[in-house]
Amino acid sequence: MKTSIGLSLLLAALILMPLAISPALAGCGDPPGPGVDWRNCNLSRQEMSKADLTKATLWRTSFNRSTLTDANLSGADANRSMFLETKMAGATLDGGRFTYADFSRADLTGASLKGANLSRARFHNAILREADLTGADIRDADFFRADLSGALWIDGKKRCGEDSVGACR
């Protein structure tokens, strides 16, 4: 009897041990705040205007159809995240990592993307009117039908013309 109890306890310990030493899981229910870990979370259709998400971990997170108007995502790590139809007018994404992120049909009017890594990001039909892209890394980014009218281009000098759809002209 003692042997079977001891064996059961040993087996339970072996099963539970990996849980004790595994990295902490993202707190998808945690409130917005600097450094929040929302990796792999579904935060679609959320109201987060003026949220402070500086240096947040947002890998593969879905913000589809959410409102992030005037939110601060400076230094955030949002690689492969989804911002489809997200309202991000006036948002700050300075110095953030958004490689492979999808901003299709997002409204980034007047947003600041200074020094952001946007390589391989998608901006299909996005609105980037008056956005500041100074110093942004846009290698292989896709601006198909994106409205770049009045945007400040990556060199920090060129202002895109009113006919800038899909490319800064």
Question: What do these predicted regions represent?
Answer:
Residues M1-L10:
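Bacterial N-terminal signal peptides that target proteins for export
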Residues L14-A24:
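C-terminal segment of classical bacterial N-terminal signal peptides
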Residues T3-S4, M17, D147:
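Hydrophobic alpha-helical context, especially transmembrane and signal-peptide helices
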Residues G6-L7, L19, A91, A121:
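Intrinsically disordered and other compositionally biased segments
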Residues A24-R169:
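Tandem repeat scaffolds
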